[in-house]
Design a protein with these regions (language model features):
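Non-transmembrane, aqueous-exposed alpha-helical and coiled segments at domain scale
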Residues: 1-424
Length: 424
């Protein structure tokens, strides 16, 4: 039995989905343990290109059981739409290969509405939300003002619980935002539609995971976003509202006593970021546009152009520490093939001094990048499958990053396809 977590080291969008898709051949169960429909995992396989927002990336592997844990913001509407899209491409989804925790809280119809209303209220001080209802959902969860998926199985208890929540939530909608209130009829129609559709998948996933572990099954925990978006350790308040770090995987999966044997941190060969907040090594103008086009850097959920720049050694080293990574997967190395020189943010300058630690969020905007560079390789490496077949300049770049961040780079991706990977 072996448990592994695949996590993001930076701002998210590092390529976690393709790594889960690759490694699931060695695992029996894949678990999503936090987040909701606010970020996408891109998977490219023989069935096409998919942007998964809620479904675990193991859904494409025959024989793999996929679990949505209690830490997930369960958006029934988006989940069902995503399921239908995947099914239409010939992928089977049944209660045998998809299990939803009865303790996962439901993202309710007003959560997305409140997200948009609050971003509009904040105007130029907005957080850059994807407007998928994530912050209002987690706020309500911790105020105990939402319902668990398991309550869908007990309608009388569900309606009693929702009545109290609805009265409280309408006060916020009407008095704070001047918005139209919701009704119980609205909620019952929503439950009759999307709630009924996911009911067959709801079960005690904690019991399932414990039994799988007892039987010697290998479990893979899949995170959303990355270290720098973690609610506690990220660039607060420009973070998500959950904990993408590996330490939360046992809690958010429904299997709190689980031990994680291997933590694969995913790092892009350059930096990208969606949303607001400090981004120390950001590029602008033509320089940014070339990298954005080369890497296809547009949000999987929103389609927004991602902010881009060179790899940030300081932020990456910090992200690795937050995750406790044992191995690194360096993705999209092939994207840098157009550059004569590969730029690297090696350190920061803060208060007139050069530093190699990640600053406290309040003073991070004052940090400036201290740059270095290495020779590029200027050739197509997308067909390379062996480490020794990479150009020397590409190997030198990978080895430099490895030394600077202090963690072994075990996997190097050179393309989006499942087999476009070099294992060192």
């Amino acid at each position: 039995m072996s448990n592994c977590a695949i996590v993001g080291i930076n701002w998210g969008d590092e390529g976690k989905g393709r790594m889960v898709d690759l490694l699931t051949s060695d695992y029996d169960v894949v678990v999503r343990y936090q987040g909701g429909g606010n970020a996408g995992h891109t998977v490219v396989n023989e069935k096409g290109k998919f942007a998964l927002h809620l479904l675990p990336s193991g859904i494409f592997r025959s024989g793999v059981v996929n679990v949505l844990g209690n830490g997930v913001a369960l958006d029934c509407e988006n989940l069902w739409t995503e399921m239908q899209d995947v099914i239409s491409k010939g992928v089977s989804i049944t209660p045998e290969n998809l299990k939803i925790s009865d303790r996962a809280s439901l993202l309710l119809p007003w959560h997305r509405e409140l997200d948009g209303l609050e971003e509009a209220r904040l105007a130029d001080k907005k957080y850059g939300s994807t407007r998928q209802g994530i912050a209002p959902f987690y706020s309500d969860k911790y105020q105990k003002k939402t319902v668990m998926a398991g309550e869908l199985l007990y309608p009388d208890k569900l309606w009693e619980h929702l009545e109290g929540i609805l009265e409280w939530k309408n006060l916020t909608l009407e008095r704070v935002y001047g918005a139209k209130p919701h009704t119980m009829e609205d909620l019952k129609a929503w439950v009759a539609d999307f709630g009924e559709k996911i009911k067959p998948f709801i079960c005690d996933t904690g019991a399932f995971l414990r039994q799988a572990s007892k039987e010697g099954k290998n479990i893979l925990f899949e995170a959303q976003l990355g270290s720098l978006r973690d609610l506690d350790y990220g660039i607060y308040p420009m973070t998500t509202s959950s904990n993408p770090i590996a330490a939360y995987a046992p809690v958010g999966s429904g299997y709190p006593e689980a031990k994680i044997d291997k933590i694969v941190g995913v790092v892009k060969a350059y930096s990208s970021c969606v949303g607001e907040g400090p981004f120390t090594c950001e590029w602008f103008g033509e320089e940014a546009e070339k990298l954005r086009e080369a890497g296809g850097e547009y949000g999987a959920k929103t389609g927004r152009p991602r902010r881009v720049g060179p790899i940030d050694i300081v932020a990456t080293r910090y992200g690795i520490q937050c995750q406790g990574a044992t191995d690194i997967a360096l993705t999209k190395l092939d994207v840098l093939s157009y550059l004569d020189e590969i730029p690297i943010c090696a350190r920061y300058e803060l208060g007139g001094e050069q530093i190699d630690y990640f600053p406290f969020p309040a003073i991070l905007p004052d940090a400036k990048p201290v740059m270095t560079s290495m020779p590029g390789w200027k050739c197509d490496i997308s067909g390379v499958r062996k480490w020794e077949d990479l150009p020397e300049a590409a190997r030198n770049y990978v080895e430099y990053v490895e030394r600077q961040v202090g963690c072994r780079i075990t996997y190097v991706s050179v393309g989006p396809e499942r087999d476009s990977i070099i294992i060192r």
